């Protein structure tokens, strides 16, 4: 960031007329890097809180509906939710909220990137679809929260590294999001795994969470 700003200052000081043309480009890059640094700081802050937040009773159905409502205003993506009333678990609510937001946001970004690439190639436009399901797991005593989309999915080469710290396919990603999600879930005796969506042909992330004991 510092080098780019210094370069811009030198161009202006030396009377280089190109500095005005470079201003927008460098400003956009500086803002992108600032956002990335902020994301990194937030990710490490989340790591620090993993051991300090006390578990509380959480209504999964209500929490998921609240988070979906934050995203369900786009014209280019359709959301569908299949819930389960009375699905309660114990966990740190702010951290679980972060997990769900991260997974939804990843799906949104993957779809929007695919839509943009299709437009650049002159390909056929498509409406994104994200389906989130909350249901009883086939594993006794657990709930499954399934996040599916019709984006490009994850390549076979990248699947093994999905939850590895610092691995990302995003140009401005920190590579900590899914790694932190897994750490949060492991602290709750939960797990997360990836598969290809059979119905939508894109990504499918399943969070398997232990039911609250009565």
Locate predicted features.
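Histidine phosphotransfer helical core of two-component systems
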Residues: 1-35
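Conserved micro-motifs of the catalytic ATP-binding
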Residues: 50-53, 88-91, 169
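A conserved beta-strand-to-alpha-helix junction within the catalytic ATP-binding
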Residues: 54-68
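Conserved catalytic submotifs in the C-terminal HATPase_c
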Residues: 78-88
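Short conserved segment of the HATPase_c
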Residues: 142, 154-165
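Short alpha-helical Gxxx[C/S/T] motif in the catalytic ATP-binding
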Residues: 177, 181
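Detector for a conserved hydrophobic position within an alpha-helical segment of the HATPase_c
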Residues: 185-186
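Conserved glycine-rich
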Residues: 190-191
């Amino acid at each position: 960031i510092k080098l780019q700003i210094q370069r811009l200052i030198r161009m202006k000081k030396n009377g280089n007329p190109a500095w005005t043309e470079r201003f927008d480009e460098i400003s956009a890059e500086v803002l992108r890097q600032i956002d990335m640094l902020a994301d990194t700081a937030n990710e490490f802050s989340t790591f620090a809180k993993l051991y300090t937040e006390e578990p509380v009773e959480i209504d999964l159905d209500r929490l998921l509906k609240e988070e979906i409502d934050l995203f369900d205003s786009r014209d280019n993506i359709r959301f569908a939710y299949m819930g389960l009333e009375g699905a309660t678990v114990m966990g740190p609510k702010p951290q679980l909220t972060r997990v769900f937001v991260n997974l939804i946001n990843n799906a949104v970004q993957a779809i929007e990137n695919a839509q943009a690439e299709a437009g650049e190639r002159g390909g056929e436009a498509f409406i994104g679809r994200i389906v989130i399901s909350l249901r009883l797991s086939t594993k006794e005593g657990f709930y499954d929260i399934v996040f599916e989309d019709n984006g490009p999915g994850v390549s076979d080469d990248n699947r093994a590294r999905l939850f590895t710290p610092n691995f990302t396919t995003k140009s401005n990603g920190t590579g900590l999001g899914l790694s932190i999600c897994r750490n949060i879930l492991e602290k709750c005796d939960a797990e997360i795994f990836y598969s290809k969506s059979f119905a939508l042909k894109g990504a499918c992330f399943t969070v398997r969470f232990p039911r609250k004991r009565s």
